[in-house]
A protein has these predicted regions:
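Outer-membrane beta-barrel proteins
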Residues: 116, 188-190, 207, 240, ...
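A glycine-rich, often tryptophan-bearing local segment used as a flexible ligand/cofactor-contacting loop or short
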Residues: 301-377
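Low-complexity, Pro/Ser/Thr- and charge-rich linker/hinge segments at domain boundaries
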Residues: 280-300
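Short, exposed coil/turn segments at beta-strand boundaries within extracellular/luminal domains
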Residues: 270-276
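Aromatic-rich peripheral "rim/lid" segments of glycoside hydrolase catalytic domains that contact
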Residues: 143-208
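Beta-strand-rich binding/interaction modules
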Residues: 196-236, 247-253, 260-270
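Histidine-centered catalytic/metal-binding microenvironments
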Residues: 135-138, 143-163, 172, 214-219, ...
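Substrate-binding/catalytic cleft of secreted carbohydrate-active enzymes
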Residues: 1-159
């Protein structure tokens, strides 16, 4: 408090704060933190929908900056090992490599790096967009864009320790969701049935030096081949700067979908601002998971299930999550590293063999995306 007060009275050119992510003092002119007296406002992970923000945790008497956003781990890239040519050697990477080799999986090392990296990029997009939607927040921090080599090593960057790209995302794609002006879209979920209607609430984050005098906002929806299924325009309007501004709402009926599909929702503001989001649409088989004389769907292995099997019939057993013994699965990659934050399950996503027949009606990439949320969470 004494140092902050001294700074304020001695130098009017700067703003002063007593700490980062620790105790707030009375003389603070801004506050960098994980939480305020109104609640936890830092954002470390995305959600399976985008219609949310952290405004209710804000609105205190000084500007608030969110501390250390995102920071989800990526599997080590063993190709970086030769780059450590000085007194610091990548012994930790060598330990991981030896462990993988001992378990007969060294040939999958690059796949593990790629799929975990793709998921971390996915998380950064959603985390940063949530930060931008939070209009009462004065900013956010990433610890860095590159990996942090201290504290046991935190491979959370989209750049490696040498500030080289990991090849996970291009600068142009990153700036679609992290730039002075960003198109944003609020919607309630990412997985739909074909008898539902998608509704998006468009916004624009504009902290550029200039107002947008005649902002022309367009939206369009494409399928996996890039074919445009529907498009439209929102009202042309004057958009201010230093804020988050509503653009309008649009809808799209999904009843034209007859087979499982991934669709991409696009939103542009003017000629230079563009962003996009994926959703997954499925036919609504209302008779699915219904017991018949030949097939029993059940959550418990009971006398009825045994009887079905004894009679040569089929049983589909789907135990409730709280009844299954084993490690709980999660969607998110581990935070920072398990040396500093040792909580279960310390996993880094999934390597999915997407070409297998079991995924014929479940559209997926090799890495996790938001259509997996419910499966892994429940």
């Amino acid at each position: 408090e004494e140092l902050t007060h001294y700074g304020r009275v001695s130098d009017k050119r700067r703003l002063f704060s007593g700490s980062t992510a620790r105790t707030r003092v009375k003389s603070d002119q801004f506050y960098i933190t994980h939480q305020t007296p109104k609640g936890h406002m830092a954002i470390y992970e995305g959600r399976p929908y985008t219609d949310w923000d952290k405004n209710k945790e804000l609105g205190i008497d000084v500007p608030v900056i969110s501390h250390e956003s995102g920071q989800r781990c990526i599997y080590p890239n063993f190709k970086e090992i030769p780059n450590f040519t000085g007194p610091v050697q990548a012994r930790n990477f060598e330990v991981f490599r030896e462990s993988l080799a001992a378990n007969g999986m060294l040939d999958q090392a690059d796949d593990f790096f790629r799929v975990s990296g793709a998921q971390t990029v996915l998380e950064y997009k959603d985390v940063i967009e949530a930060e931008l939607r939070t209009s009462l927040k004065s900013g956010f921090q990433l610890l860095a864009l590159n990996d942090f080599t201290g504290q046991g090593y935190a491979p959370v960057g989209i750049l490696d320790p040498f500030w080289e790209s990991k090849g996970l995302i291009t600068p142009e794609k990153f700036r679609e969701f992290c730039a002075p002006t960003v198109a944003l879209l609020r919607f309630p979920k990412r997985a739909y049935y074909c008898d539902e209607t998608f509704e998006g609430k468009a916004e624009v984050y504009n902290y550029s030096p200039s107002i947008l005098k005649s902002a022309k906002a367009k939206w369009w929806i494409t399928d996996a081949s890039g074919r445009v299924l529907k498009s439209g325009r929102l009202k042309t309007q004057r958009i201010g700067n230093y804020g988050v501004f509503p653009l309008g709402t649009f809808q799209y009926m999904l009843n034209s979908v007859t087979a499982p599909q991934k669709l991409t929702i696009h939103l542009s503001v003017g000629d230079k601002v563009h962003n996009s989001w994926d959703i997954w649409v499925y036919p609504h088989h209302k008779d699915l998971m219904q017991t018949t004389p030949d097939v029993l769907y059940t959550t418990t292995y009971d006398a009825k299930a045994k009887q079905y099997l004894q009679e040569g019939k089929k049983v589909v057993l789907c135990p409730k999550p709280n009844k299954v013994k084993g490690r709980k699965s999660v969607f998110h990659n581990h935070f920072w590293n398990p040396i500093m934050f040792k909580w279960a399950p310390t996993t880094l996503g999934c390597l999915i063999h997407a070409d297998q027949p079991m995924f014929a009606d479940f559209i997926t990439e090799k890495h996790l995306d938001w259509q997996w949320w419910d499966i892994l969470t429940n």
